[in-house]
Amino acid sequence: MEELSIIRSKPKPGHYGKFVKSLKHFISLPDRKGIVDSFIMTKDEEVFSIVVRHADQLESDSKQGLKYLNTVRHMLQEYNEIDRHTIPLTGDLVE
């Protein structure tokens, strides 16, 4: 089974290009095992990271993602007190 994750974020003014470049680098790292495919989508002032991965790698890959988020959090605006800097959505990919 494969999982699809969409992580929504909104860079602070002046950090958009740097954040997108950093995200491109992160999602292409070879140590991200279990990744089947990945994309970056932009719309208006938001950036969406879209990743398809093997379901059995979801937990370990999510931990890598949180470590990465901690390195770029200063570049992101908070959505609200609950979601904070990202709005994630993950579910089973139906083919």
Language-model regions, residue ranges each:
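An amphipathic, aromatic/His-enriched active-site/gating alpha helix that lines ligand/cofactor pockets
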Residues: 25-37, 52-86
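A short beta-turn/loop motif at secondary-structure boundaries
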Residues: 39-45
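A generic structural motif
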Residues: 46-52
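Short, low-order "capping/linker" segments at domain edges
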Residues: 85-95
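Short beta-strand segments enriched in hydrophobic/aromatic residues
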Residues: 11, 42, 53-54
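Short hydrophobic/aromatic beta-strand element in the GNAT-like acyltransferase core
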Residues: 4, 37-38
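Short glycine-/aliphatic-rich beta-strand segments at the starts of folded cytosolic domains
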Residues: 1-11
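Short, surface-exposed ligand-recognition loops at beta-strand->loop->(often short) alpha-helix junctions
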Residues: 10-21
